[in-house]
Amino acid sequence: MSVITIQCRLFSEEESLLYLWELMTQKNTPLINELLELIGKHPELEEWIQKGKLPTGLVKTLCNSLKTDLRFSGQPGRFYSSAITLVDYIYKSWIALQQRRERQISRKERWLSMLKSDAELEKDCNCSLDVIRAKATEVLTQIATPSDLHYNQPTENKKGKKSKKGKADKAHGKLFSLLFDAYENTTDPLERCSLAYLLKNGCQISELEEDPEKFATRRRAKEIEIERLKEQLNSRLPKGRNLTGEKSIEALETATHNVPKNEDEAKAGQATLLRKSTSVPFPVGYETNEDLTWFKNDQGRICVRFNGLSEHTFEIWCDQRQLHLFQRFLEDQQTKRDSKNQHSSSLFTLRAARICWLKRQGKGLMWNKYRLILYCSLDTRLLTEQGTQQVISEKAAKIAKILTLTKDKEELDDKQQAFVKRQQSTLDRINTPFLRPSKPLYQGQSSILIGVSLGLKKAATVAVVDAKQDRVLTYRSVKQLLGENYKLLNRQRQVSARHSHERHKAQKQKKPNQFKESELGQYLDRLLALEIIAIAKTYQAGSIVLPKLGDMREIITSEVQARAEQKIPGYKEGQKKYAKQYRVSVHRWSYGRLIECIQSLAAKTGIAIEVGQQPIRGSPQEKARDLALSAYSSRITSMN
């Protein structure tokens, strides 16, 4: 993606700020709350969850029915559109999470149904363990290929470290899938038990006697995972923002006068009381770039007016580094006006915008305690002449395809004819490009990838991989990436540890425990991102591969557990204590913020971003390498 987001403060007269504050807090946010509640109470919600989406036009229909309600009437049209888009997005995300949890539960329950002790396997097939092992050896020879068997036995290099770990993990995963499919498809008791024996022992024949306590702990751990997922599956529906605090008061009255019927109801009531309500209204989004009108006032300041709020003018207060971008927004719109609409707004640098309130330190009225912020999304390719030509080519090809498909239809209704006319007009006008400065586009080699692995001890580790040659060009640790600034990382760890200790003491004394973090972590993220982009330019990398954030909890948990088992083998309580101390000693990193910094700088440079699943096992260097190779392999597979 080549889209980045910038922000600025909007300054205006107090009357304008008051009007916008009341409109967003008393009209728009209550409307969004009502829409969320209506969908949550709909009798067909479970059916929509199974389908994976809400019916097309449902949110819009509900919103239209509420427009006549005095509580929500009198808003600009764009405010209603923003509410519809936001509610649809919230439920789309929530339904996706619910479906993911259901899939996880299904997979774990399948595994749990197969996971049996050696004694249970002997009883199911009425055979001894030696017979099961012999059958397992036979099945393994039939199903596994020679390469699978080879990689199933880890080899060691001269230094005693396991080699070809990435290939071994891949081969092991393939063999595991084959064995599990065979288990699902066979009905022979002995064969099923032998397959179950192989699967629970990591696709190998174990010569050791099974420890009943360890097996019981392993099975119970999986049961707990399923129970936790089911609790999350039954979690509360999406709720709005409680700006007035009325719901908190209602929950307090309920808890005062009613005794909980069971433990679950008590937990739910406690969670409601402890939940910190926000006093910030929902943002308002402007999805089209012509909803904003740019101009300069008498003092020469750049100002903006919004569609539906044309009587109110807002000055742009921004950083000097971003001023030229807002100047570009103004120039684009001025160019189109001067040319009498011979230019197309589809080539405006600005793509979309959003206004919201941001809390700040201050006293007085609510609209003075909060700053009005404007977020603008822009396409970095439209900042240069070469990038604009690239966008024109893409849009022209897309419109030509649409027109070809539409013209193949024999009869078109009035809406379709108007749509064809608009597309043809856009196609004619995009050939009149805006004046842009010339700057060569970044040209990287598609076979060279930058893999970035994230971890608890090592925040970021980089591997530059030539996937076509299947070799690593270089590695970079977090210490090498930061260079002389590595000492700042130690300072960040000390600050984080101190805040953690102070927060723990405040919680025990039931005092406020929200300690404001410094911007040192954000500064370190920017330094890491800058160095990663510099490495990509040096090696002419075609893309940067980042791990999925959804996998970070499992990755970090696995990393801590592996370290604990290595330090204190065979002692569970000691491992738990060590893991807790280890988490305190290392930093708590904002991986999402780091990824955003890398994505933003990559978009400005023109380097593609790919997302993959980071391996759980291996060193940080091996994880970064395997992440890049996996992304390249997936890319080749999708192309074929």
Question: Where would I find each of the regions flagged by the language model?
Answer:
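Nucleic-acid substrate recognition interfaces
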Residues: 1-450, 454-640
